[in-house]
């Protein structure tokens, strides 16, 4: 977040600024606020922040009950705040804006322009009608009232400490009012009062009324509790008497239980400093008496200390051959991934397992990331522990809760170590990309200490309160995408990418792993159910669309349930053989429409290649033109980068084809480019060559072979740059029936990752320039760039190509 300078004092003449309509928010001077801005306003503020040291706006609260679609000048209060915009960030609902109130202002006039509100405003000055002694007395009463309110809520100490440090009633008002449940009009009235005396006394009145409401609610709750019927009260007393009698009879057992703790601690493998802590807690337990309310919490804490593994067991030597055998038997395909894991284990063996590298397995859902972690544990002969971090928003989930809170628990890391019972398990941190920050802290930041080899030997859990050594643990994290993983966390891990399975690999996995597993889960065997290979191929192609095999497993389970019902009903002859033509009856209609290469040749239509989180896909780029004024229209939910690629492509076409025999009047024609599947957002630079080829094909009226696909980024100088996701894109082209692929020359080395069966059935054309692209796609030689006639030929020199 960049810091912006404050504004210098200015004379009181009217000034003009953009207006930020504030829904359900009133911002006070000297206070900070967060609110959402619409996309247009947010983009303006973001752009201004890039070009200016400080950015301001007028914050005017929207009157209650007004919808965003019904905003008008009359729906805004005229008294607001001059805001210093300190932070603007895109979000799902618009733009998140953080601002600080500078001074109260009045909107002298309001008007709309291009869907935005603007105001001419002037400062609203305070009426200094309060002497210093009276103000000091009111501030003391305000702080006292806030302390009385806060005392009713647990964990409010930090809040009141912040209040005590403030030396201005206006500052306290801006800090406290967002938490007071009063009507919006009342909050606005507090802002509009120019009289310092009236404003401060109204604020004190609001606080006092809020305190009385809280006291009333507590009193009413107490009265409801006191209205328990006499019979229920007697029953409760009888139960209490019974418990007291049992406690009195078993007092010796309780004492012996505490003595057992002492013996267990003395005989444990805890380090000396941990034993010292345990004996300190035990002393509290022994001296607290039978009525000690902390006794259950102390016993839980001592149980945790006794259950945790404190010493490293004798380590087994890593058997690389056995590790390779386990990985090969449990996982088809993923040869490079398995080789990376074997190399990692070899390093551990040479370093005697005292390693600092953390593995991160990244790949689409269902590609075996978690099961790879289980296989590594099996190969090492270690305990396997897995925790899912998807949706975790609270830092306490990682670090634990402090024991001062009721129901406090250790964090998931310490709980996992307790469950493992050994100091060197294989610990899977599943879905680390699904962590998210909230008001309760950032769990991703808490993981930094866990995954940093320099720090995790003294990991601090809030519940445990003493350092715990995690350096012997082999942590393996999994994620679907690294885009949502904070860079400091990503920097601490060694990334292994799992791109997904080919059709042949999925078929092998289904035959060797999934089908036997499904048969066992449904009480079947190979003598009762057989699924033909062709049927498996149809299920893979027509009933699943994924990089992994999780959906395939679900469809096979559905097939097994269908057959089980047939067998139990006596309607099936054994073995029941599932053929491809039977799948419609078993699984219903085909649910996946695979994109396939088009059969017809149409000028302006070219096949491109795309990467998605579930693998690759092909896409079609279509172009057409009509009489107009030289406008370019782009549709199909294209992102900013893809739109820029389209503009670059059009500029290249205009510069290279302007004086050809196929002369095309760009100034009197509009061009429309569309990318089908309009409901799916698309972005990235890799469609550059496809867009350029589609435009060229459209202009010269010559069609591109529908069995040809291409990918690559282009520059204004006509160079073709490398792109990512080559393996997934090539596999998608192979599935779709594409025969030839144009790709950047620098991506030629990425073809090594493509399975050999797919490589052998495709022709690859590596290119470095757009001239090579058109020569291969349209069989034409592209003219040299047109130099404007106004250029002085003798002094022309080509620009440096970045």
Curated annotation (Swiss-Prot):
PANTHER family, alphabetized: ATP DEPENDENT LON PROTEASE FAMILY MEMBER
GO molecular function, one term: ATP-dependent peptidase activity
Domain Lon N-terminal span(s) in chain numbering: 17-211
Lineage, uppermost ranks: Archaea, Methanobacteriati, Methanobacteriota, Stenosarchaea group, Methanomicrobia
Organism: Methanosarcina barkeri (strain Fusaro / DSM 804)
Name recorded for this polypeptide: Lon protease
Alphabetic keyword roster: ATP-binding, Cytoplasm, Hydrolase, Nucleotide-binding, Protease, Serine protease, Stress response
Catalytic residues (UniProt): 686, 729
Reported function: ATP-dependent serine protease that mediates the selective degradation of mutant and abnormal proteins as well as certain short-lived regulatory proteins. Required for cellular homeostasis and for survival from DNA damage and developmental changes induced by stress. Degrades polypeptides processively to yield small peptide fragments that are 5 to 10 amino acids long. Binds to DNA in a double-stranded, site-specific manner.
Predominant location: cytoplasm
């Amino acid at each position: 977040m960049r810091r912006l300078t404050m504004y210098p004092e200015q004379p009181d003449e009217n000034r003009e600024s953009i207006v930020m309509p504030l829904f359900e928010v009133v911002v006070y001077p000297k206070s900070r606020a967060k609110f959402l801005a619409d996309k247009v306003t947010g983009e303006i503020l973001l752009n201004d922040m890039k070009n200016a040291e400080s950015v301001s706006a007028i914050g005017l609260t929207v009157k209650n009950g007004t919808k965003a679609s019904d905003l008008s000048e009359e729906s805004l209060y005229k008294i607001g705040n001059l805001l210093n915009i300190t932070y603007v960030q895109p979000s799902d609902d618009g733009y998140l804006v953080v601002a600080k109130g500078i001074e109260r202002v009045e909107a002298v006039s309001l008007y709309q322009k291009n869907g935005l509100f603007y105001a001419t405003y002037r400062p609203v000055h305070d009426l200094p009608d309060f002497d210093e002694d009276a103000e000091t007395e009111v501030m003391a009463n305000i702080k006292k009232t806030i302390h009385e309110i806060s005392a009713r809520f647990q964990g409010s100490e930090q809040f009141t400490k912040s209040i005590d440090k403030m030396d201005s009633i206006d500052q306290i008002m801006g800090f406290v009012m967002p938490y007071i449940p009063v009507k919006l009009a009342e909050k606005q009235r507090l802002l509009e009062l120019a009289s310092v005396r009236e404003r401060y006394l109204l604020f004190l009145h609001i606080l006092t009324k809020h305190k009385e409401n809280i006291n009333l609610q507590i009193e009413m709750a107490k009265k409801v509790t006191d209205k328990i019927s006499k019979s229920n009260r007697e029953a409760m007393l009888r139960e209490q008497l019974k418990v007291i009698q049992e406690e009195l009879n078993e007092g010796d057992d309780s004492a012996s239980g505490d003595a057992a703790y002492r013996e267990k601690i003395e005989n444990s493998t805890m380090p000396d400093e941990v034993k010292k802590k345990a004996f300190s807690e035990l002393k509290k337990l022994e001296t607290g008496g039978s009525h000690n309310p902390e006794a259950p919490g102390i016993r839980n804490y001592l149980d945790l200390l006794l259950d945790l593994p404190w010493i490293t067991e004798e380590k087994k030597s890593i058997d690389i051959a056995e590790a390779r055998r386990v990985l090969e038997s449990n996982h088809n395909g993923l040869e490079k991934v398995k080789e990376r894991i074997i190399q990692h284990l070899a390093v551990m063996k040479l370093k005697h397992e005292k390693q600092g590298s953390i593995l991160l397995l990244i790949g689409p859902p269902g590609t075996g990331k978690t099961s790879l972690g289980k296989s590594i544990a099996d190969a090492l002969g270690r305990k396997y522990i897995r925790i899912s971090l998807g949706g975790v928003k609270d830092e306490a989930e990682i670090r634990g809760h402090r024991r001062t809170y009721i129901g406090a628990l250790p964090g998931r890391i310490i709980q996992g170590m307790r469950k493992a019972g050994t100091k060197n398990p294989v610990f899977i941190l599943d879905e680390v990309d699904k962590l998210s920050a909230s008001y309760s802290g950032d769990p991703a930041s808490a993981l930094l200490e866990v995954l940093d080899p320099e720090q995790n030997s003294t990991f601090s859990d809030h519940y445990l309160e003493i350092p715990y050594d995690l350096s012997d643990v082999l942590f393996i994290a999994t994620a679907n995408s690294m885009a949502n993983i904070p860079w400091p966390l990503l920097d601490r891990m060694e990334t292994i990418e799992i791109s997904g399975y080919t059709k042949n690999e999925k078929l092998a996995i289904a035959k060797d792993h999934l089908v036997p597993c499904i048969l066992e889960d449904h009480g079947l065997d190979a003598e009762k159910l057989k699924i033909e290979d062709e049927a498996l191929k149809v299920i893979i192609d027509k009933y699943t669309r994924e990089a992994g095999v999780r959906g395939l497993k679900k469809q096979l389970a559905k097939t097994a349930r269908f057959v089980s019902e047939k067998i139990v009903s006596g309607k099936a002859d054994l073995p029941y053989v599932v053929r491809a033509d039977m799948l419609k009856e078993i699984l219903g209609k085909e649910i996946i429409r695979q994109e396939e290469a088009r059969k017809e040749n149409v000028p302006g239509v070219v096949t491109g290649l795309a990467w998605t989180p579930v693998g690759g896909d092909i896409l079609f780029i279509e172009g057409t033109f009509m009489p107009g004024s030289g406008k370019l229209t782009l549709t199909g939910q294209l992102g900013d980068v893809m739109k820029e690629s389209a503009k670059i492509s059009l500029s290249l076409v205009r510069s290279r084809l302007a004086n050809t025999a196929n002369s095309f009047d760009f100034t009197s024609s509009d061009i429309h480019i569309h990318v089908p599947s309009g409901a799916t957002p698309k972005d990235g630079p890799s469609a550059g060559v496809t867009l350029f080829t589609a435009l060229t094909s459209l202009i010269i009226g010559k069609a591109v072979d529908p069995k040809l696909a291409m990918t690559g980024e282009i520059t204004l100088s006509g160079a073709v740059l490398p792109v990512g996701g080559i393996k997934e894109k090539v596999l998608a082209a192979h599935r779709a029936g594409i025969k030839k692929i144009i790709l950047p020359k620098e991506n030629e080395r990425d073809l090594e990752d493509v399975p050999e069966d797919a490589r052998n059935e495709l022709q690859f054309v590596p290119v470095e320039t757009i001239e090579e692209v058109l020569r291969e796609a349209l069989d034409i030689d592209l003219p040299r760039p047109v130099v404007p006639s106004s250029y002085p030929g003798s002094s022309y020199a080509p620009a440096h190509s970045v």
